[in-house]
UniProtKB/Swiss-Prot annotation:
Protein name: Sporulation-specific protein 22
Function noted in UniProt: Redundant with SPS2 for the organization of the beta-glucan layer of the spore wall.
Membrane disposition: Lipid-anchor; GPI-anchor
Signal peptide stretch: 1-25
Keyword Repeat (UniProt): yes
Family statement: Belongs to the SPS2 family.
Gene3D superfamilies per record: Receptor L-domain
Annotated glycan sites: 256, 314, 327
Positions of the propeptide segment: 441-463
Lipidation positions, renumbered (GPI-anchor amidated asparagine): 440
One example of a Gene Ontology biological process annotation: ascospore wall assembly
Subcellular location per the Swiss-Prot or TrEMBL entry: Cell membrane
InterPro entries noted in UniProt: CWI-Assembly_Regulator, Rcpt_L-dom_sf
């Protein structure tokens, strides 16, 4: 009995010692979650990178044929036609020095998640089976990023891409989803997006200067927004959705601009166009380019059916021609008060009632003005106050309603000849000549029955 009592006391002492040790340890070092990870932060389900952890970037150009990477990764061109080819490449390479071309790919998904950098171009083309492209770790494409002829492609996921020289996507007709860090990607040469189902093309905040900006034939595209400042070559937007709103709030200088089929154009900082500027078949009501000062080629404002207001108050020089035609809601051309010179010809046609150029001193080409309105006064052009015409291109024609005035001038503006024609009378004479032709025809089969002749005569004189 005493033995049992002693054993019980021993167990009690051991248990008490363990309890005290555990309690003291807990007080000194409280329990922590594994790695101190908070799985969700402020309700955000995305895992966030620590602030002091730099984003991975690689300079592919620093790698060379002597770098300690697989010989496979140093090839100038990799052609991938199957998932087996791709597995073999990605099993050995995170970085490739040359270009990657995917063509006639045999799978629905192109998984490039193992690649981090491409030293040449990434070209994915002519793969009608391809539905999705994913490249979750791809950071840099030193050359062209091209998608072309991918008729089943729906989504592109490239969330970490920070640089490519040019972006060219053509004939990807059902592409409607792109996961891309467009606010941080840098593109230094061309942006061409054609024949997609994208609804928005936005941001490109780091894109400051490029050679080409061409967005066309994207039938569902409703918004284009970019912070680009200079376009060294062609800036073209056309054949997208009629509701398209184009906003380039920082654009200052462009080589050449053609804008069609838009409902809004916002270019508040545009100062200089080195070549031509054309707005054709748009749906906007107002065109405000109040900071534009010089156009190195032709200015064309053509067939914009809703246009009622234009602001070009600071434009002083057009080195090419000036064409304003078929803008059926535009009632006057008085929006160029500081224009001093037109280096080419003038062509105006519409229903405008007034034309006014307060500062215009010289038109180096000819001029043709035609308005269906009888209110337009051609005399201010045909009877210059100082006796010399500002038109120096040889001939001037102004048609107001049914009246036509013409001038022939020398290169110094001296008027050689004036002309006037009543187009109403000319129309009546033309009708009479047609009737006379049939009435006096020597061929009996061509002669008119007197009753029919009388009916034709009345109809033609009335109409």
């Amino acid at each position: 009995m005493n033995r049992i009592t002693r054993k019980s006391c021993l167990f009690a002492i051991i248990f008490a010692s363990l309890f005290v040790t555990h309690a003291l340890g807990a007080a000194i070092d409280p329990p922590r979650r594994p790695h101190n990870v908070k799985p969700f932060h402020n309700g955000n389900l995305e895992l966030q990178r620590r602030a002091n952890e730099p984003f991975f970037e690689i300079d592919v150009k620093s790698l060379n044929t002597n770098s300690p990477i697989s010989e496979l990764c140093k090839k100038d061109l990799h052609v991938i036609e199957s998932s087996h080819d791709l597995f073999h490449l990605q099993n050995q390479c995170e970085f490739i020095l040359g270009s990657l071309k995917v063509t006639n790919y045999d799978s629905n998904i192109l998984d490039l998640n193992s690649l981090r950098a491409i030293g040449g171009d990434l070209i994915i083309q002519d793969s009608p089976e391809l539905i999705r492209i994913q490249a979750g770790n791809l950071n840099k494409i030193e050359g062209l990023f091209q998608l072309q002829g991918l008729t089943s492609l729906v989504s592109v996921e490239i969330p970490t891409l920070k640089f490519c020289q040019s972006l060219e996507w053509k004939v990807v007709p059902i592409l409607n989803y792109v996961s891309m860090d467009s606010q941080n990607i840098e593109i230094i040469k061309d942006i061409v997006i054609s024949d997609t189902s994208l609804a928005n093309i936005e941001n490109f905040n780091k894109v400051q200067e490029i050679d080409t900006f061409n967005i066309n034939n994207n039938r569902f595209l409703e918004t284009i927004h970019s912070n680009v400042k200079t376009i060294r070559g062609q800036f073209s937007v056309h054949a997208n959705a009629k509701e398209l709103e184009l906003e380039m709030p920082h654009l200052r200088e462009v080589e050449n601009i053609t804008i069609r089929d838009t409902s809004l154009v916002y270019l508040p900082q545009l100062t200089k166009v080195k070549s031509s500027l054309e707005f054709i078949e748009n749906y906007f009501y107002e065109l405000n380019l109040n900071n534009l000062q010089k156009i190195g080629g032709t200015l064309g404002i053509i067939n914009n059916v809703n246009l009622i207001k234009v602001n070009l108050e600071n434009l002083t020089d057009i080195q090419g021609g000036l064409m304003i035609a078929d803008n059926e809601s535009l009632e006057d051309i008085t929006f160029l008060p500081n224009l001093k010179q037109i280096g080419g010809a003038i062509f105006f046609e519409g229903s405008f009632k007034d034309i006014m150029f307060d500062s215009l001193k010289l038109v180096k080409g000819s001029a043709f003005i035609k308005s269906s309105s009888n209110v337009l006064d051609c005399n201010k052009w045909t009877n210059p106050s100082n006796g010399r015409s500002i038109i120096r291109g040889g001939k001037f024609t102004c048609i107001s309603g049914k009246k036509e005035n013409t001038l022939n001038v020398k290169q110094d503006g001296t008027i050689i000849e004036k002309g006037y024609k009543d187009l109403t009378q000319e129309g009546e004479d033309s009708k009479k000549r047609v009737i006379s032709k049939y009435a006096n025809s020597a061929n009996p089969s061509m002669q008119l029955d007197p009753l029919l002749f009388g009916t034709c005569l009345v109809a033609m004189l009335l109409f």
